[in-house]
């Protein structure tokens, strides 16, 4: 039984700790997005959804207490279960892959899958960092910081500071152009955030609407980027300007079996051909996609030249450049509307967000095959290939 993506929507991406979602819980944000997603398929009886699969990199605090179950009950009904999964930066893409796999296995007909992350409310390493002593004895790089892995990748694959700054500048320019053209408008769910607080002893409320990605800096220049200090290593090349932004966001797709979409009279937009992961030395975490991409192509029976467009998560500029260099990707078809350096990287949300962006841009360009790929903390890579219908 084949699985198909029927629709997909995302929130705008907020700047962590100072953006429009800084005080907004991601379970609330997910409910907003999923309710909108369901409303776009009026034929759907939401109580018949088999499961809601939510990717989340830090499922604790406001994202804990089995957050997926809370989301499923509030967004679709108490009859609908929910499960939270974690493959760190790839969690959203993994959630879609799991939904597709369940349909293909005959374990259900309708799934909502995607991801969430609030980097405003939850610390990047969680509330209690507790590395394994035994693991560190075996290999101290098992728990190495992501910025240091980026520096290791830059050194090993000879990525220069100049190339990294230029890549970062281009990410912002492409993203700014996309926003000015309204390319993300149809996929973003406007979210009204209501805030209640005490002022002069009185209860005060105010609201604002977030409907545009907040991290893009049209005014940035290569010169300005070149003046930033290294963020992780003395004499290194990785700066705040060439790193992905800390962000808040949510993104979800609706996955159905062929039997179900025909029964409902719904037209699918794409299918996930395959999705697979690979492992690499944690020291060179960012190169993970180089392991995952060939595996995905082999499983799909495709060549790299068949992939007309790729969304490569820009964890760091040097990391993205190394992946493009080592995997043989065509730079002209990678992140055509900018990437995480400009648009942000809400960890567990990103894989689903990139999938939605990819499918919409493939439609505009009338393309058949596209790929989403990302490195994953701890030394992994993931690649998912989509066929637009």
Q: Model-found features: residue ranges?
A:
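Short, well-ordered amphipathic alpha-helical segments that serve as non-catalytic structural scaffolds
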Residues: 26-42, 67-71, 95, 146-153, ...
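Conserved catalytic cysteine-centered active-site region
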Residues: 24, 58-109, 141-148, 219-245, ...
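Active-site pocket-lining segment
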Residues: 187, 273-342
């Amino acid at each position: 039984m084949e699985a198909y993506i029927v629709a997909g929507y995302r929130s705008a991406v907020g700047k962590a700790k100072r953006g429009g979602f800084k005080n907004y819980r991601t379970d609330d944000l997910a409910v907003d997005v999923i309710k909108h997603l369901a409303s776009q398929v009026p034929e759907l009886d939401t109580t018949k959804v088999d499961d809601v699969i939510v990717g989340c990199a830090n499922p604790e605090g406001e994202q804990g207490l089995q957050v997926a179950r809370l989301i499923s009950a509030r967004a679709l009904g108490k009859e609908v279960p929910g499960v939270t999964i974690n493959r760190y930066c790839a969690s959203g893409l993994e959630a879609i892959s799991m939904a597709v796999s369940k349909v293909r296995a005959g374990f259900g007909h309708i799934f909502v899958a995607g991801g969430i992350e609030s980097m405003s409310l939850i610390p990047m390493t969680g509330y209690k960092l507790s590395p394994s002593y035994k693991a560190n004895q075996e290999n101290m790089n098992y728990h190495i910081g992501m910025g240091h892995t980026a520096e290791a990748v830059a050194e090993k694959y000879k990525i220069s500071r100049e190339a990294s700054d230029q890549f970062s500048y281009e990410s912002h320019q492409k993203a700014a152009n996309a926003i000015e053209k309204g390319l993300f408008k149809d996929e973003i769910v406007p979210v009204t955030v209501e805030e209640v607080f005490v002022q002069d002893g009185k209860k005060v409320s105010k609201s604002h609407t977030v409907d545009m990605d907040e991290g893009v800096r049209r005014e940035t220049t290569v010169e300005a980027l070149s003046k930033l200090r290294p963020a992780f290593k003395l004499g290194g090349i990785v700066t705040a300007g060439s790193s992905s932004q800390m962000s808040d966001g949510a993104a979800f797709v609706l996955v159905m079996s062929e039997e179900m979409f025909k029964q409902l009279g719904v037209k699918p937009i794409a299918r996930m051909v395959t999705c697979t992961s690979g492992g690499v030395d944690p020291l060179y975490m960012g190169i993970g996609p180089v392991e995952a991409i060939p595996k995905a192509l082999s499983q799909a029976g495709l060549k790299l030249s068949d992939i007309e467009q790729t969304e490569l998560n820009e964890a760091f500029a040097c990391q993205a450049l190394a992946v493009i260099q080592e995997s043989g990707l065509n730079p002209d078809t990678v992140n055509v509307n900018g990437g995480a350096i400009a648009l942000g990287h809400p960890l567990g949300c990103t894989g689903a967000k990139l999938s939605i962006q990819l499918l919409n841009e493939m439609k505009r360009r009338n393309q058949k095959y596209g790929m989403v790929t990302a490195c994953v903390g701890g030394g992994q890579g993931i690649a998912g290939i989509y066929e637009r219908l």
